[in-house]
Amino acid sequence: MAEINKQSNKWEQEEVSNENNWELAEEESVDWRGRPSNPNKHGGMRAALFVLGLQAFEIMGIAAVGNNLITYVINEMHFPLSKAANIVTNFVGTIFIFALLGGYLSDAFLGSFWTIIIFGFVELSGFILLSVQAHLPQLKPPKCNPLIDQTCEEAKGFKAMIFFMALYLVALGSGCVKPNMIAHGADQFSQSHPKQSKRLSSYFNAAYFAFSMGELIALTLLVWVQTHSGMDIGFGVSAAAMTMGIISLVSGTMYFRNKRPRRSIFTPIAHVIVAAILKRKLASPSDPRMLHGDHHVANDVVPSSTLPHTPRFRFLDKACIKIQDTNTKESPWRLCTVTQVEQVKTLISLVPIFASTIVFNTILAQLQTFSVQQGSSMNTRLSNSFHIPPASLQAIPYIMLIFLVPLYDSFLVPFARKLTGHNSGIPPLTRIGIGLFLSTFSMVSAAMLEKKRRDSSVLDGRILSIFWITPQFLIFGISEMFTAVGLIEFFYKQSAKGMESFLMALTYCSYSFGFYFSSVLVSVVNKITSTSVDSKGWLGENDLNKDRLDLFYWLLAVLSLLNFLSYLFWSRWNIKSSRRNNTNVVGDENI
């Protein structure tokens, strides 16, 4: 232990405010051979750069597939528009559902590094199979233009099976890789070390920058390849990008500090719930100091220091009541510590914050489906010889963000730190709220543009330039920079030891629920607005000039505003319940 202190002091040459926690964090991390990590050799931004490389290449590959998938599904597989939109949203939603599996396997059994390696190859195999399926004519329906010929043969049977098998291999691999990329990079920093804590916040911004770079290349270069060289070549390039990402990760093996997996991450949570139920008839003591706080079980998923008692969810406090007049040691299924109970309370308090981002991601789903189709109905000509692929519209915010994110981290964050005293500059909960508020205006812009585009096409016979669609993508890009990064940082800093990857997976589940909700919303809106046999609803036609996409966007704008108001309530509740005991938590901020 003394040797670790010596190395840590030599590394930073400054006083560590919480030395015991720093030492414990170092003991819990190991190198690739399972030996205790050395702060002079392992971790830090140098190690995180290899993970950022993987993140850029992985998002490059998956974004090139996902963002142009609706065009492929309609033009090559011949699915109708509404069904194609649901295929895309279900695919993206499933990716983020699989994130839960990846987070669980990492925290409980494999560790983040090996989880990424194993499922990285699963994702790679899916890209390769997609490329083969797109290349061989016998694995696709006969060529046909669905906009001209209404009798195009839809992919069915063996052809559909191959397509969906490849698609969901990609979903399984990407889903299990995503939360572990973020967690593994963040694991290279210690929250208990003041300087490292600031670097952790910068890492989350750097991770979003890597994400933006990957998205930008995917939505420009890779989509251009798909459009001009064919989807088979495009899917092959995605496979090559994933290969480069795996190579980037493996190259950093010698520098990583890895956290050991901790058996079942759900058992300590179950201990608290079962103990509280078994003692439900007991009265909770008015003095929290009477609650049991010294019963620690080896390998329990608890933070390195104890958590103070909070008055929220008082029913769970009954799990800490020690039965009097007995000398026998109670089972962990009947007696828990205050820290264990408080950790479960924290997880429960994250639920409304998590739920508040679902509608936000439903809006994202529209930008990857209907907004791409909007672009297809507009004038894509940039010059006599160059047309903008509609899927490349989504590159618009990322072009801006590759400049905005470094400026945010270099200038706005230091300035905000002086005002707020928070290591992140703008605290995570505030950051989430800013993004949720801005997303409403993305849908307002989209609705106004669609009304103008439809009227120009139907009434005047004019086709608007594709540049009119820019504002809705720009506004949402800025909102995503605030909400997505804020949510990841908030969840990571609230997570218990050994649950980092799983909590990161929950942030991705917000994407999943958002995309699934989009599918449900489209179906419900179509059903409600289908007034007759001839009317298929707002989104039931394959022709946007006959659909009422503008009204659907207005509906989403209203839902987004209501969602923001709901978030204000729950975020204030989260802050208030945390401040009652003067706990120094990431959510202690003004909104």
UniProtKB/Swiss-Prot annotation:
Compositionally biased region (Polar residues): 1-10
Tissue expr: Expressed in flowers. Detected in roots and siliques.
InterPro entries: MFS_trans_sf, POT_fam, PTR2_symporter_CS
Domain of life the protein comes from: Eukaryota
Compartments, record wording: Membrane
Keywords assigned: Membrane, Transmembrane, Transmembrane helix, Transport
Topology with respect to the bilayer: Multi-pass membrane protein
GO cellular component, one term: membrane
Molecular-function annotations in GO: transmembrane transporter activity
Cross-referenced Pfam families: PTR2
Protein name as it appears in the record: Protein NRT1/ PTR FAMILY 4.3
Organism name: Arabidopsis thaliana (Mouse-ear cress)
